[in-house]
Amino acid sequence: LGTEAVEAHLELADPSLDSAVAQLAAQGVTRAALVPLLFTNAFHNKIDVPEAVREAQDRHGVQLLVGPHLGTGVDVARVLINTLPHSLPAGAHLILYTVGSSDAAANVAAENLAWELSLLSGHTVDVAYATSGPGVGFGGAAVIEAACGYEDVHILPLFVTDGLLLDRVIDQVDHIAVATGARITYSTPLKTALAPLVAARYRAALSELLTAAHA
């Protein structure tokens, strides 16, 4: 993109958005684009991000142009498919492992992404939720339920990076294999594979700014 990029976090990690914006303000920056690294339009995207943006703008005088979140569209599905190992058997079952939400629409978006993954990859796909969502179990229990009846299972994490929720399942892979009788493999979090999508959301934020300027 040819521009400086900094990271910021809503919670559980540093720097916070407020700290990152304070640093930008100290450097003389008056305007910055912000891309929420969120897949679904649930509480974090609807409430937490706008609130953090308002507070940082008011405190430091830096205008934040908020672009679209990552979403669960075809571009995300293609990034996920690109993480599949070439050695994956043709009949392997995929489990899209995602955080889950109390927002039903967010979980529907994850289910729709699983459907898109199945269309694009030719594999069967189920969704397993880490914390909340439809189903009787979460985390490792949800993965076991989704893996039963298949010989080869590959876990696709819908995660930007490593973290406790994902570690809890990856650390249980051997147990899941014993419980289901399946051969279990897994992809790593998406990390830098998301860079083209982040760039596209950044451009969308700039486009919105230019449109507003000429309105």
Show where each model-derived region lies.
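Active-site-proximal alpha-helix that buttresses catalytic centers in soluble enzyme cores
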Residues: 1-215
